[in-house]
């Protein structure tokens, strides 16, 4: 659980880097290409995993909870106080803030489900976040394969997010699109 909480802290903390280092460059990464870039888990995941393990070290459940709360508060303040068209470092290249925020919403929805699943709870109700996450993953699917959700996932954003993010088996060979 500490590592999952540390992941929340790290993924939201990246927002402050983008806001703190505005660039006068053209964005080269958008919300969908961000996830296409991380889709090869064999290259990206080990680096992120080790960073998160290190980030979790020394924390207790209480200290990581406080840290994550502080990071989310700071990130939300930074987002609200920065024009959405601000361009800054977005992990894989320059990104607009609004495009980067969309990726943070996907992370929040997917890893929020990881957390509630681990606790045996239903997913937290986050309708706007769920809609945005599903839209981003729909776009990733459209760019990586044949567009369009499998028929059984039409109209069920949570089930689609779960399948598209590899949080459950689905017979469609196009899924998952991210890990």
Give names to the regions the model predicted.
Residues 2-49:
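Conserved alpha-helical segments that form or flank metal/cofactor-binding pockets of metalloenzymes
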Residues 17-32, 56-61, 66, 76-179:
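Structured surface interface patches that mediate subunit assembly and partner/cofactor docking
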Residues 37, 44, 48-67:
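A short, structured beta-strand-centered segment in the mid-to-C-terminal lobe
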Residues 9-10, 73, 113:
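Solvent-exposed alpha-helix faces
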């Amino acid at each position: 659980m500490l590592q999952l909480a540390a992941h929340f802290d790290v993924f939201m903390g990246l927002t402050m880097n983008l806001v703190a280092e505005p660039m006068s460059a053209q964005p080269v990464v958008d919300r969908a290409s961000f996830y296409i870039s991380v889709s090869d888990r064999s290259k990206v995941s080990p680096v992120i995993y080790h960073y998160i393990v290190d980030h979790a070290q020394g924390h207790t459940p209480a200290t990581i909870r406080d840290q994550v709360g502080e990071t989310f508060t700071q990130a939300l303040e930074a987002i609200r106080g920065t024009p959405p068209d601000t361009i800054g470092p977005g992990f894989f290249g320059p990104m607009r803030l609004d495009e980067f925020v969309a990726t943070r919403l996907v992370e929040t929805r997917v890893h929020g489900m990881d957390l509630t699943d681990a606790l045996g709870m239903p997913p937290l109700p986050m309708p706007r976040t769920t809609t945005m996450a599903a839209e981003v993953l729909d776009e990733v699917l459209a760019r990586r394969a044949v567009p369009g959700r499998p028929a059984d996932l039409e109209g069920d954003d949570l089930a689609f997010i779960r399948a598209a993010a590899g949080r459950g088996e689905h017979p469609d060979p196009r899924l998952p699109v991210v890990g």
